[in-house]
Amino acid sequence: ISFLCTFHSRDLEGYNKRKDAFVKRLLIKNPTLFYSSTRYPVRMDIKSMEMYRQMNFQRDPMSWSADDAMFLLPKDDKAKLFSSQFHISIESTSVDNYFSEKLIDALITKTVPIYWGCPNIGDFFDIRGMIIVDSESDIIELCNQITPETYEQMKPYIDENYERAKEYARPLRDRVKEEIEKKIKESNVKQNS
Protein backbone atom coordinates (compact mmCIF):
# COMPACT_ATOMS: atom_id res chain seq x y z
CA ILE A 1 0.00 0.00 0.00
CA SER A 2 1.55 3.29 -1.07
CA PHE A 3 0.75 6.90 -0.26
CA LEU A 4 2.22 10.31 -1.04
CA CYS A 5 1.46 13.08 1.42
CA THR A 6 2.41 16.71 1.07
CA PHE A 7 2.01 19.48 3.58
CA HIS A 8 0.00 22.48 2.46
CA SER A 9 -1.42 25.03 4.82
CA ARG A 10 -4.65 25.10 2.81
CA ASP A 11 -7.61 24.15 4.94
CA LEU A 12 -9.36 21.85 2.48
CA GLU A 13 -10.99 18.64 3.64
CA GLY A 14 -8.76 16.44 1.48
CA TYR A 15 -5.53 17.98 2.78
CA ASN A 16 -6.66 17.36 6.34
CA LYS A 17 -7.63 13.75 5.54
CA ARG A 18 -4.18 13.18 3.98
CA LYS A 19 -2.39 14.55 7.03
CA ASP A 20 -4.55 12.50 9.40
CA ALA A 21 -3.97 9.32 7.37
CA PHE A 22 -0.23 10.01 7.37
CA VAL A 23 -0.18 10.46 11.14
CA LYS A 24 -2.16 7.22 11.66
CA ARG A 25 -0.03 5.21 9.21
CA LEU A 26 1.47 3.07 11.97
CA LEU A 27 -1.97 1.55 12.57
CA ILE A 28 -1.82 -0.11 9.14
CA LYS A 29 -0.61 -3.69 9.57
CA ASN A 30 -0.04 -4.46 5.87
CA PRO A 31 3.28 -3.42 4.28
CA THR A 32 3.30 0.25 3.31
CA LEU A 33 5.35 2.67 1.25
CA PHE A 34 4.48 6.09 2.64
CA TYR A 35 6.31 9.06 1.17
CA SER A 36 6.45 12.78 1.64
CA SER A 37 7.01 15.09 -1.29
CA THR A 38 10.35 16.88 -1.32
CA ARG A 39 8.57 20.02 -2.54
CA TYR A 40 6.12 20.16 0.37
CA PRO A 41 7.46 17.80 3.05
CA VAL A 42 5.06 16.68 5.74
CA ARG A 43 5.40 18.62 8.95
CA MET A 44 3.48 17.96 12.09
CA ASP A 45 1.06 20.62 13.22
CA ILE A 46 -0.29 20.84 16.75
CA LYS A 47 -3.49 18.91 15.92
CA SER A 48 -1.50 16.07 14.34
CA MET A 49 0.97 15.90 17.24
CA GLU A 50 -1.90 15.68 19.73
CA MET A 51 -3.61 12.95 17.68
CA TYR A 52 -0.35 11.02 17.60
CA ARG A 53 0.10 11.32 21.37
CA GLN A 54 -3.47 10.07 21.94
CA MET A 55 -2.61 6.98 19.92
CA ASN A 56 0.16 6.25 22.48
CA PHE A 57 2.91 5.68 19.96
CA GLN A 58 6.34 5.63 21.52
CA ARG A 59 8.30 6.97 18.56
CA ASP A 60 8.46 10.44 17.10
CA PRO A 61 5.74 10.46 14.42
CA MET A 62 8.03 12.19 11.98
CA SER A 63 10.98 9.84 12.36
CA TRP A 64 11.98 8.79 8.86
CA SER A 65 12.47 5.15 9.69
CA ALA A 66 13.48 2.61 7.06
CA ASP A 67 11.48 0.08 9.07
CA ASP A 68 8.33 1.96 8.10
CA ALA A 69 9.46 2.31 4.47
CA MET A 70 8.85 6.01 4.90
CA PHE A 71 11.10 8.36 2.94
CA LEU A 72 11.13 11.60 1.10
CA LEU A 73 10.04 10.65 -2.40
CA PRO A 74 13.27 10.41 -4.42
CA LYS A 75 13.41 13.22 -7.00
CA ASP A 76 9.64 13.50 -6.64
CA ASP A 77 9.43 10.53 -9.02
CA LYS A 78 5.97 9.00 -8.58
CA ALA A 79 6.89 5.75 -10.34
CA LYS A 80 7.94 4.21 -7.03
CA LEU A 81 4.44 4.82 -5.63
CA PHE A 82 2.74 2.71 -8.23
CA SER A 83 4.87 -0.38 -7.88
CA SER A 84 2.44 -1.39 -5.14
CA GLN A 85 -0.93 -3.03 -5.72
CA PHE A 86 -2.86 -0.41 -3.72
CA HIS A 87 -2.44 3.34 -3.39
CA ILE A 88 -4.20 5.79 -1.10
CA SER A 89 -5.63 8.50 -3.38
CA ILE A 90 -7.21 11.44 -1.58
CA GLU A 91 -8.46 14.38 -3.64
CA SER A 92 -8.17 17.91 -2.26
CA THR A 93 -11.93 18.23 -2.17
CA SER A 94 -15.09 16.20 -2.72
CA VAL A 95 -17.06 17.63 -5.66
CA ASP A 96 -19.25 15.91 -8.25
CA ASN A 97 -17.50 15.28 -11.58
CA TYR A 98 -14.06 16.27 -10.23
CA PHE A 99 -11.13 13.89 -10.04
CA SER A 100 -7.45 14.47 -10.68
CA GLU A 101 -4.14 12.81 -11.36
CA LYS A 102 -4.31 11.46 -7.82
CA LEU A 103 -6.83 8.94 -9.16
CA ILE A 104 -5.73 8.67 -12.80
CA ASP A 105 -2.09 7.94 -11.89
CA ALA A 106 -3.22 4.92 -9.88
CA LEU A 107 -5.65 3.63 -12.50
CA ILE A 108 -3.24 4.04 -15.41
CA THR A 109 -0.66 1.93 -13.57
CA LYS A 110 -3.23 -0.74 -12.62
CA THR A 111 -2.84 0.17 -8.97
CA VAL A 112 -6.07 -0.04 -6.97
CA PRO A 113 -6.92 3.37 -5.54
CA ILE A 114 -8.08 3.54 -1.94
CA TYR A 115 -10.10 6.58 -2.88
CA TRP A 116 -11.75 9.61 -1.34
CA GLY A 117 -13.04 12.42 -3.50
CA CYS A 118 -15.54 12.59 -6.34
CA PRO A 119 -18.93 11.46 -4.92
CA ASN A 120 -20.15 10.27 -8.32
CA ILE A 121 -16.92 8.56 -9.38
CA GLY A 122 -19.00 5.51 -10.34
CA ASP A 123 -20.27 7.54 -13.33
CA PHE A 124 -16.72 7.46 -14.72
CA PHE A 125 -15.08 4.28 -13.40
CA ASP A 126 -16.10 0.86 -12.12
CA ILE A 127 -15.97 1.18 -8.35
CA ARG A 128 -15.52 -2.58 -8.04
CA GLY A 129 -11.92 -1.84 -9.10
CA MET A 130 -11.50 0.74 -6.35
CA ILE A 131 -11.77 0.90 -2.57
CA ILE A 132 -13.97 3.87 -1.67
CA VAL A 133 -13.45 5.48 1.74
CA ASP A 134 -15.19 8.24 3.69
CA SER A 135 -12.67 8.98 6.43
CA GLU A 136 -9.12 8.35 7.56
CA SER A 137 -10.53 5.71 9.94
CA ASP A 138 -11.99 3.93 6.89
CA ILE A 139 -8.58 4.11 5.25
CA ILE A 140 -6.90 2.38 8.18
CA GLU A 141 -9.65 -0.23 8.56
CA LEU A 142 -9.83 -1.09 4.85
CA CYS A 143 -6.03 -1.15 4.45
CA ASN A 144 -5.93 -3.72 7.23
CA GLN A 145 -8.58 -5.85 5.48
CA ILE A 146 -6.59 -6.14 2.25
CA THR A 147 -5.27 -9.66 1.65
CA PRO A 148 -3.04 -11.07 -1.11
CA GLU A 149 -6.22 -12.27 -2.83
CA THR A 150 -7.93 -8.86 -2.84
CA TYR A 151 -6.05 -7.57 -5.87
CA GLU A 152 -6.64 -10.73 -7.92
CA GLN A 153 -10.36 -10.66 -7.14
CA MET A 154 -10.55 -7.07 -8.40
CA LYS A 155 -8.45 -7.71 -11.54
CA PRO A 156 -11.26 -7.58 -14.17
CA TYR A 157 -12.39 -4.19 -12.82
CA ILE A 158 -8.81 -2.93 -12.52
CA ASP A 159 -8.33 -3.73 -16.21
CA GLU A 160 -11.60 -1.98 -17.13
CA ASN A 161 -10.63 1.12 -15.14
CA TYR A 162 -7.23 1.12 -16.84
CA GLU A 163 -8.93 1.27 -20.25
CA ARG A 164 -11.22 4.09 -19.13
CA ALA A 165 -8.36 6.03 -17.47
CA LYS A 166 -6.31 6.03 -20.68
CA GLU A 167 -8.82 8.48 -22.15
CA TYR A 168 -8.37 10.91 -19.22
CA ALA A 169 -4.58 10.52 -19.28
CA ARG A 170 -4.41 11.88 -22.82
CA PRO A 171 -3.40 15.54 -23.15
CA LEU A 172 -6.35 17.86 -22.70
CA ARG A 173 -5.59 19.69 -25.95
CA ASP A 174 -6.00 16.42 -27.89
CA ARG A 175 -9.32 15.63 -26.23
CA VAL A 176 -10.63 19.17 -26.80
CA LYS A 177 -9.49 19.13 -30.44
CA GLU A 178 -11.25 15.79 -31.06
CA GLU A 179 -14.43 17.00 -29.39
CA ILE A 180 -14.47 20.18 -31.50
CA GLU A 181 -13.86 18.20 -34.68
CA LYS A 182 -16.66 15.80 -33.71
CA LYS A 183 -19.11 18.67 -33.13
CA ILE A 184 -18.16 20.31 -36.45
CA LYS A 185 -18.69 17.01 -38.26
CA GLU A 186 -22.08 16.52 -36.57
CA SER A 187 -23.07 20.06 -37.52
CA ASN A 188 -22.05 19.50 -41.15
CA VAL A 189 -24.05 16.25 -41.31
CA LYS A 190 -27.16 18.06 -39.99
CA GLN A 191 -26.73 20.87 -42.53
CA ASN A 192 -26.36 18.41 -45.41
CA SER A 193 -29.44 16.41 -44.39
What residue ranges belong to the model's regions?
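Catalytic phosphate/metal-binding cores of nucleic-acid and nucleotide-processing enzymes, i.e., regions
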Residues: 78, 139, 158
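Residues at or immediately preceding the N-termini of alpha-helices
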Residues: 103, 136-139, 151
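Conserved acidic donor-binding segment of nucleotide-sugar-dependent glycosyltransferases
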Residues: 131-136, 148
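Short, charged, surface-exposed secondary-structure boundary motifs
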Residues: 124-125, 140-146
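Nucleotide-sugar donor-binding catalytic core of glycosyltransferases
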Residues: 1-129, 161-188
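Conserved donor-nucleotide binding/catalytic region of nucleotide-linked donor-dependent transferases
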Residues: 144-161
